[in-house]
């Protein structure tokens, strides 16, 4: 945090809230705004309060891969500040309150009617899908424990006070890329979120970071692997996923 810092943007990664008590405390002492990146955390909560109301502004995504996904791109911002709400509403329509009169440089960020219609239908199923994902996460915990793979596979941990919605079920493993190729051969889908840390992205080269600047992030990027977690996943399918991972490490 420097004199140029205006806001802090914590990310509720994979469906679990960041430590908002600590982050909000730091921000308050420094006079900063806090913007929640809750794109992967719709329905998540911390100490009984939902993601999206834990800071000044909450940001959600309705990209099709999210727990509540549309038929294309879309999103939502939340705030209990009337002034911020008015400013955000203006920015989403080209910086305009009155048609063809622009008070600021804005963007075209309106949710189109098709996306709204799809989301309206799907919204009533969100809690059901969330419970399915949480059930499957608990089942993975049991299956990996029974398979005696906890020395090979580091499972996700839910921080006390958090309600995890498992947008992804992300484990950490050695030989990640080899394991992923093996699972693909066995018909098991997986994804890597994310393969390259932010400080090593080309767009940030001018900041002077290099490999070794953030070794914890770099190691995580080499080990993370997201396994199937969608609500309709059966116990037999999950058992097969775990069985194949066990077969790889034997």
Task: Cite the ranges covered by each PLM segment.
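PLP-dependent aminotransferase class I/II
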Residues: 7-11, 16, 20-22, 29, ...
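Active-site phosphate-binding strand-loop segment of PLP-dependent enzymes
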Residues: 1-70, 76-78
